Amino acid sequence: MNVQESQPAQAAPPPNKKSAVLVIDDEPSLLEVFSAALSPHFEVTTASSVREAEFILHKNPFKVVIADHLMPGGNGMSFLVRAREEFPHMQRILVTGYMKPEMLLRSVNEAALFRYLLKPVSVAELIKVVQDAAKLHDQSVLAG
């Protein structure tokens, strides 16, 4: 009798299961807009500070995290750099109202961002970017 041992492969989530997304911004109105835009497509959790986001991130798995750059009590870029170290498959998106070349360079080199979005962000662009990020997360997990 020939018995083959096989390792269980990590499967992609079922098609009906929404991908988990964490959105961090200190502006309640933007959190509300982002959540309303993304909720039909994703399981959205919001945080209004870096400290709150760090707590949430360690309690739940997320495929994608979206962070505002400048927030009181911490900045989104530093948060995303730490998140990359702890959760390398999780895709990171930085949203900001301004762009400085050195910040763009740091975001690419240190945080390995999936995308860098300038405010104002259109709802269609936001949804598309998060969908693409969630797909890349799944491919990254499957690839090991």
Ranges and model annotations:
Residues 31, 72-73, 96:
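The feature encodes the CheY-like receiver
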Residues 46-64:
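Acidic, metal-coordinating helix/loop segments flanking the phosphotransfer/catalytic sites
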Residues 48-49, 75-78:
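Acidic catalytic/metal-coordinating carboxylates
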Residues 121-130, 134, 138:
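C-terminal output helix
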Residues 28-46:
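Two-component/phosphorelay signaling modules centered on CheY-like receiver
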Residues 27, 69-70:
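The short loop immediately C-terminal to the conserved phospho-acceptor aspartate in CheY-like receiver
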Residues 78, 99-116:
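Alpha4 helix (beta4-alpha4-beta5 surface) of REC/receiver domains from two-component response regulators
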Residues 55, 77-89:
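Short amphipathic alpha-helix used as the core "switch/output" element in two-component signaling
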